[in-house]
Amino acid sequence: MNYPHEFDVIVVGGGHAGTEAALAAARSGAKTLLLTHNIETLGQMSCNPSIGGIGKGHLVKEVDALGGAMAIATDEAGIQFRILNSSKGPAVRATRAQADRVLYRKAIRHRLENQENLWLFQQSVEDLIVEGDKVVGAVTQIGLKFRGRAVVLTAGTFLNGLIHVGLQHYSGGRAGDPPANSLGQRLKELKLPQGRLKTGTPPRIDGRTINYSVLEEQPGDLDPIPVFSFMGSAALHPRQLPCWITHTNERTHDIIRGGLDRSPMYSGVIEGIGPRYCPSIEDKIHRFADKPSHQIFLEPEGLDTHEVYPNGVSTSLPFDVQYELIHSLPGLEHAHILRPGYAIEYDYFDPRGLKSSLETKAISGLFFAGQINGTTGYEEAAAQGLLAGINAARYASDREAWVPRRDEAYLGVLVDDLVTRGVTEPYRMFTSRAEYRLSLREDNADLRLTEIGRELGLVDDIRWDVFNRKRDAIQAEVQRLQSTWVNPRLLPEEPAQALLGKAIEREYALADLLKRPNISYEALMQARNGAGELLAGPGLLGDDVLAEQVEIQIKYAGYIERQRDEVQKHVVHEQQAIPADIDYDAVSSLSFEVRQKLKTHRPETVGQAARISGVTPAAVSLLLIHLKRLHYGKRAI
């Protein structure tokens, strides 16, 4: 039957991409339907119980700045928080949290069930309704037809999913869930370019059978306690737990080597390529054969469970080998395995077949987000889901898509990398992928994106008010420090020596003093003048977030300004559109190889064309000349 109501946006899948897509579309004002095979697993953390990390935490902060759910849900569910790279510069510092799986799922479901314009329905999707080259709905396993103006597909690892444990394999979307084989077959019929990828997960351990006395404890950060959401606070955090560290040894490695002949990876059973930066334990032992030991993190899965996730031993080895290797680890000699580790192969679609909006080029109104695009990780999925949800809603209401630039957000870097370069292995975000990372920091994600989110209809009044007060306070303090001056009379030799390590010989703005590498904002605010009074006043002391932002903006002002100038030089051609119907064969001055690459990838902008492997700067110049001729030719007509 046909469902009696139509929707603007239909989201298929309730993982990290699907939930953010549904929330974003609904917040944008679109009548949205989220279809999931099981409402109980909405927001499920299928693999590791953690959110964030280098590059990944930046994406989570950006999703949050645009009104998304992942960061605040992590604050409500996080049982350990840490800042990675805390001793390095602000551009590469990153937040990471261990999360209670049950609390996280509960936090996400609460937001889904209380979001206006959003309907939930439990049914697996087996088919898409496509009319001509346009998607108009989805069909569930009982033949129920839902019609909508746009469809966002976030199928994760479910498309023709195949689970491997040793040389045994069976169909599944993840352990305990059926695959989406019918939908996978339907997508193949649409002639979308596709391939196979692989990911894996470790066996889970009963924490009551671990000997913690021989392990190294790894507590979370306490001063200050990190917070993920710009709307969050440490008061939201549940009880905190430590993680623990153990190591592999030569016996572990011998056990693994002895089982490689029954490994689906090394016996040729698995076709898909796995994530480079999250390799299986057998892959690590094989690739780094000279390394005598590998670190393993034992991560608690939640407050009300004894289950422990051994991060670092993802494996698809036979269970008897898994059993032996786990028991070879210090502290785990008598550990009970609750669930076996496994690898899963699944279909993905070449993201070069997508527009930058994440709409497929072949089928109008069909958007892809998450692992279906060849990425790995909850954070990458959530970011894509948010963007796909925004643009599906805009498509449904005949509005222009929003696409962040590489200099605006890690989300812009992520999408541009995918649609321009494609993937040959699961894509993971790192700060090193962003050429403008000094400007794209975790700490300023809201200052970069919340105003845009407000314009897109994603940011509610409460968040908008909090953001405005924060932004105004930072701007006022920066201006005060830039316009307040001190001279040798106000700061005589003795207090100057205490603050600066030497006397000042002329007048300085407080901002100039703060730019010095050995001066912190806190030290400047606590400095006294010759009369024993505060030199700069209390300022924003007491609010670590605002104080940090003021210090970063002033200390890095010169570097950021140079980067801004660099962006301005590139942005003119970066965003210059290339007509969808351009005839590259008419650009005879381009080499045959370059013309073939451009015809294959069909870049949307000159910036995208420039990042295609093999397209040289000289070729870009020739393309610009041709586009200029086309422009003037149209004007003449």
From Swiss-Prot:
Its Gene Ontology biological processes? tRNA methylation; tRNA wobble uridine modification
Broad class of the protein's primary localization: cytoplasm
Disulphide-bonded residues: none
Cite the entry's keywords alphabetically. Answer: Cytoplasm, FAD, Flavoprotein, NAD, tRNA processing
Q: Where does FAD bind?
A: 13-18
What GO annotations for molecular function exist for this entry? Answer: flavin adenine dinucleotide binding
> Is this entry keyworded Metal-binding?
no
Binding positions for NAD(+)? 274-288
Q: What does the annotation say about its assembly with partners?
A: Homodimer. Heterotetramer of two MnmE and two MnmG subunits.
HAMAP family to which the protein is assigned, alphabetical: MnmG_GidA
> What is this protein's function per UniProt?
NAD-binding protein involved in the addition of a carboxymethylaminomethyl (cmnm) group at the wobble position (U34) of certain tRNAs, forming tRNA-cmnm(5)s(2)U34.
What name does UniProt use for this protein?
tRNA uridine 5-carboxymethylaminomethyl modification enzyme MnmG
Provenance organism: Bordetella avium (strain 197N)
